[in-house]
Every structure is written in C-alpha cells, then in structure tokens.
From Swiss-Prot:
Sn-glycerol 3-phosphate binds at T16, R84, E85, Y135, D242. It is an enzyme of class 2 (transferase). ADP binds at T16, R20, T264, G307, G408. Keywords: ATP-binding, Glycerol metabolism, Kinase, Nucleotide-binding, Transferase. This is Glycerol kinase. GO terms for biological process: glycerol catabolic process; glycerol metabolic process; glycerol-3-phosphate metabolic process. It catalyses: glycerol + ATP = sn-glycerol 3-phosphate + ADP + H(+). Disulfide bonds: none annotated. ATP binds at T16, T17, S18, T264, G307, Q311, G408.
Length: 501
C-alpha cells in the first residue's frame, strides 16, 4: 500500500501503568500501536508515585514504534489523553520535576481532604462538581508545596510549573513553549470552577496554592503548540482526560448519550449538555469544550471493582488459568443459581460510597458450582452499572435509551447481553474499542480541520454489535431486587467486625 498520500493522527494515551501511542488514518482505522510499561513506586504505605522521566521515555518509545511504518511528515496532528488527576510540579527553567508525580491512587493527603470535607464540602462541590478526596490534584499540589524543600519559595517567585500528565507532556513536546491544559483535565484538579470556567481563587487561597504555577486552560480541540520531537513541526491539537476522551470517542455528542468503560474498575459518563447538574451521589465534570468559554458537561460514576474481580477469581481462587476462561465457564450454566457476588474488596463506589463495605458471595447451596460463581462475578459488573445509570437518570431527569460500551470486558458477549437485559436498554459495542485514543485523535483532527464537524465524525464511527434486551420485566425486577439485598448485607461490614478499612 502506498501510504505517502495518507494523512495520519497520532494519539498519545498515557495511562497508569503504560504509555501508548496509536496511529489513526483519516477514516479512524488503527494503523499501528506502540505500548511500553513503566513502574509505579510505593515509597510508603498509601503512597503511589511515578517518575515523570520514566513516563516521558516510555511515551517516546511508544511513539517510535507507532510511527515506524510511515514518514512522520504525514502526521497532521497529535492528541494527548491521560490518566487524570496525577500531579507533577517542575522547575520552570530546567524543566526538571521537583518531586515524583503523585498518582491519582495515592492516599497520603487524606488529612488535608478530611479537613476540607468537614469544613468546605458544599463550597467545593458547588464550584468544582467534585467531593474533597485525595483522588484529585489539589491536595497533592499542596502536599508537594508543603513538604518538598524550597518548592513553596520557588513557586511564590513564579519558578515552578504544575501540570497533570497532559500538561507535562505538552510542555516537553514543545520544549517548554506551551504550559496548557484543557477544560476536561482542569475540571479534575478540584481547583477549577466549572461554572465560570476559570481557576477558583477562593480555593487557591484556602490551600495556599499560587495561581502562577497553574497552566492556561484551553478548549479540548485547539492548536496548543508545535512539537519537533519527531523531526518536523507537528501541531498538538487535542487534549482530554481519558474518560472524557472515551465519551467523545463513542460519539456521545448528544444529551443523554452514555458510555461505560469496563477496566479494572468501571467508569460511566453521561453527556448532560451545556449546564452542570448538581448530583448527590455522582461527580459533575466537564466532558470537553470545543470553543473558548463553552463546555459540555457530564455526570460521572466510578465503580471500584469490575474486571479486578475476574483477576481475583483467576489469581486469588485459582478457579481459572486465564481471564478469558470466565465467559465459557459462566455460559455453561443457565443462570446464577441464586448466587450473587458483591465485589466490595475496597468498599463500594458510586452510588453507595461506603468504604466499610466488603466483598460477599451469597445464595450458595450444595448445588453451587464454580460456574455459578463465575456467572455471578460477570453479572455483578452489570448490576453495578445499572446502579449508576439509575441514579444518573433520576438526578438528571434525562432518559437513557442505549449504552455504549468499551474496555476489556465489553468483548464478553454473555456479559453484554446480560447488561442489556438487566437495564432494559440496547447496548452498543463499537468496531474500534480503543475509544480513549480514538476520542483524542478526533479532537486533534478537528483542531487542524482534518474533519470539519461532529456529524462527519459520527458518520465514520462504526458499530460492531448491538445487544437487544430480551428478558421479561418480571425476571429483571426479581434479579435486580436480589442484587440490592446482597449489597445491603455487604455494606458496613468492616465496621461491624472491626476489620481494616
């Protein structure tokens, strides 16, 4: 094939354990993929860090592999998507990080966020759409400023830059010329006012974070700068947090369109349009912004354990040798045999938010086999997804007609059919499952005019399979009511027995 006439978009997908680079053509087909892992560092219990230099090296190796079969001059745009919230501070002159990146999973800043929760919960939720938690960037920045020698002094003098990983990579790719982020990543820092679309001075003053260290916030599709890292000048023109990029990559451009990504845990995002909706049990976040001072918003629910339960079935119970064996095993029985599995290994996330819940298998009889447990594990992913979607519908008053899916478990036909059955809506699986990278490739291509409209992108996007609900309402109600009873029994367990939280 003569590729010289082709135009390509390069998506950099910087995750929690690996850096990936995916090359897309103008029809959004995947041309090549590069992926390199990098280590996580655990200096103390509850601490999770990355070396930013290792991230950069892994990312550039992934790029080299992804573009190995083409001429870099054919790349018309670069897009960046990233693990959200992870925090880097670096020296503005030398570009060297002043401390390791503090990862989103890190819990060291719990005392700071406990104080915020006790005293400023409503103010922070109203302004940022988030709840005070170590998960978000704000307390991580404060920790570095307070605990790393001379950093606060340098920050006060304007000599320190902060960024989430997208910002750090754009800075490196442009040789320090661009210190920017997009609306979606800014909305995960707990410092960004999602109503006014600007850094919030009240929160910055509360945490004593100088505004000078923060990047400029721009739309998710715009030329931020140019990179010479591949030998010629290429515009960097797309930027979005990983879950928001996946929503865009699922062409969920309309209000009420929703996607679920099934990974170790699951993330469910729903497009709620031009106005943020206040939610009791979910996060309100910015989905993306395609113009200055305009944003699309989303409700987000995070489920802590979905795919990780399959890993536990494989490694903890040694019930299967490889993860792919769970679907045929679960398919070997007609139903769950009355068995429910609540995967509350680390508590329950949305919409329960119970850190004291613990894992539970209930309904076991003498006739229960490992196939029934396998089925109950798969079904738990679908039940938890319904839990979140029900709250989304209730709190937004938006009706949901279908669910778009991606991530590892979305390849499982048994699970996807059960997902459609238990919610009672159509489940749609796309042809290209790399929706996070595809989403930011779309944003980058829009930013340079490779594609001209959302309608054009929607017409290119292809469906692999649709799963239509076939379960009776009576059966659906009975199964879901059993799940809710099982969850009740799992909640608060660590408090009752004094187990470790």
């Amino acid at each position: 094939m003569n590729t010289m006439s082709h135009k390509f978009v390069l998506a950099l997908d910087e995750g929690t354990t690996s850096a990936r680079a995916i090359l897309f053509d103008s029809d959004l087909n995947i041309v090549n993929i590069g992926q390199y892992e990098f280590p996580q560092h655990y200096p103390q219990p509850g601490y999770v860090e990355h070396d930013p230099e290792e991230i950069w090296e892994a990312q550039m190796l992934a790029v080299k592999k992804a573009i190995s079969k083409i001429d870099a001059k054919q790349i018309v745009a670069i897009g960046i998507t990233n693990q959200r919230e992870t925090t880097v501070l670096w020296d503005a002159k030398s570009g060297k990080p002043v401390y390791n990146a503090i990862v989103w999973q890190d819990r060291r800043t719990s005392p700071i966020t406990d104080w915020l929760k006790a005293n400023y919960f409503k103010m922070i939720k109203d302004k940022t759409g988030l709840v005070p938690d170590p998960y978000f960037s704000a307390s991580k920045i404060k920790w570095i400023l307070d605990n790393v020698s001379n950093v606060r002094e340098k920050a006060e003098r304007g000599e320190i830059k902060f960024g989430t990983i997208d910002t750090y990579l754009i800075w490196r790719l442009t040789n320090g010329k661009a210190h920017v982020t997009d609306y979606s990543n800014a909305s995960r820092t707990m410092l960004f006012n999602i109503n006014k679309l600007e850094w919030d001075r009240e929160i910055l003053e509360l945490l004593k974070i100088p505004e000078s260290i923060l990047p400029e916030v721009k739309p998710s599709s715009e030329i931020y700068g140019y990179s010479e890292a591949l030998g010629n000048l290429i515009p960097i023109s797309g930027d979005a947090g990983d879950q928001q990029a996946a929503l865009f990559g699922q062409v969920a451009f309309n209000v009420g369109e929703i996607k679920a990504t099934y990974g170790t845990g699951s993330f469910i995002l729903m497009n709620i349009g031009n106005n943020p909706i206040r939610s009791e049990n979910l996060l309100t976040t910015i989905a993306w912004g395609l113009e200055k001072n305009k944003a699309k918003y989303a409700l987000e629910g995070s489920i802590f354990i979905t795919g990780a339960a399959v890993q536990w079935f494989r490694d903890g119970l040694r019930a299967i040798d490889v993860s792919d064996e769970i679907e045929p095993l679960a398919s070997s029985v007609e139903d769950n045999g009355g068995v429910y599995f609540v995967p509350a290994f680390v508590g329950l996330g949305a919409p329960y938010w119970d850190p004291y819940a613990r894992g539970l298998i209930i309904g076991i009889t003498r006739g229960t086999t490992k196939a029934h447990i396998a089925r109950a594990i798969l079904e738990s992913m679908a039940y938890q997804t319904r839990d979140v979607i029900e709250v989304m519908q209730k709190e937004s008053s938006i009706s949901i007609n279908s669910l778009k899916v991606d991530g590892g478990a979305a390849k499982d036909n048994l699970l996807m059919q059960f997902q459609a059955d238990i919610i009672g809506i159509k489940v749609i699986r796309p042809k290209v499952m790399e929706t996070t990278s595809m989403g930011v490739a779309m944003l980058a291509g829009l930013g340079v005019g490779l594609w001209n409209s959302l309608e054009e992108l929607r017409s290119i996007w292809k469906v692999d399979k649709e799963f239509i609900p076939s379960m009776s309402e009576e059966k659906r109600r009975a199964l879901y009511s059993g799940w809710k009873e099982a969850v009740k029994r799992a909640m608060g367990w660590a408090k009752v027995v004094g187990g470790q939280v």
